[in-house]
């Protein structure tokens, strides 16, 4: 599993999570294509992921990066960590992420680590259960981050003050 990182001129951090070779068998033999899974973030709470397919690896990666930039979401962080513990699932992959104290670092594996790094999370404890397929882990991580809300937004929805919520 590749874990390349680039910093672009737009200020986005780009990470390559996975490149996969796929074969289609035809009458004359096999046709190989490549799929790429990438994550892009600004390190301040905006993060996106994308998948790209092509006959060449660089083209697949480029398509995935463009898809990731189009598919960005805003994550409400509490400083350098999460607001509260989050559970999420996609397919057979289940992820659990919980906030950690300052200086803990990102304790997460594989694809989940890449997503959290580009999102700007610096202190988190995370675990992946079930399938560790990078595509499903990235989807599950995004689902969990997307569902997370700040105390201010919860208070506004309920028509109460933040102190009453906490």
UniProtKB/Swiss-Prot annotation:
One Pfam family name from the record? Ribosomal_S5
Q: Which UniProt keywords apply?
A: Ribonucleoprotein, Ribosomal protein, RNA-binding, rRNA-binding
Q: Which Gene3D superfamilies match?
A: 3.30.160.20, 3.30.230.10
Q: Which residues form the S5 DRBM domain?
A: 12-75
- Top-level taxon of origin: Bacteria
For the keyword Protein biosynthesis, the answer is no
A molecular function (GO) held by this record is: structural constituent of ribosome
Q: Which GO terms describe its cellular component?
A: small ribosomal subunit
Instruction: Return one Gene Ontology term, BP aspect.
Output: translation
Function of this protein? With S4 and S12 plays an important role in translational accuracy.
Q: Which family does it belong to?
A: Belongs to the universal ribosomal protein uS5 family.
Question: Its quaternary structure?
Answer: Part of the 30S ribosomal subunit. Contacts proteins S4 and S8.
Q: What is known of its domains?
A: The N-terminal domain interacts with the head of the 30S subunit; the C-terminal domain interacts with the body and contacts protein S4. The interaction surface between S4 and S5 is involved in control of translational fidelity.
* Protein name according to UniProt: Small ribosomal subunit protein uS5
Origin organism is Azotobacter vinelandii (strain DJ / ATCC BAA-1303)
Primary gene name: rpsE
């Amino acid at each position: 599993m590749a874990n390349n990182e680039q910093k672009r001129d737009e200020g986005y951090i780009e990470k390559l999570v996975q490149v996969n070779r796929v074969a289609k068998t035809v009458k004359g033999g096999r046709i190989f294509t490549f799929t790429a899974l990438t994550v892009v973030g600004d390190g301040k709470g905006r993060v996106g992921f994308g998948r790209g397919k092509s006959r060449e690896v660089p083209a697949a990666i480029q398509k995935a990066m463009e898809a990731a930039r189009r598919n960005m979401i805003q994550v409400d962080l509490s400083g350098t960590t999460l607001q509260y513990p989050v559970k999420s699932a996609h397919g057979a992959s289940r992820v659990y992420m919980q906030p950690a104290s300052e200086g803990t670092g990102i304790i997460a594996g594989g694809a989940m680590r890449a997503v959290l790094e580009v999102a700007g999370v610096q202190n988190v404890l995370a675990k992946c259960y079930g399938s560790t397929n990078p595509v499903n882990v990235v989807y599950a991580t995004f689902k969990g981050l997307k569902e997370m809300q700040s105390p201010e937004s919860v208070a506004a929805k309920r028509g109460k003050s933040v102190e009453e919520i906490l």
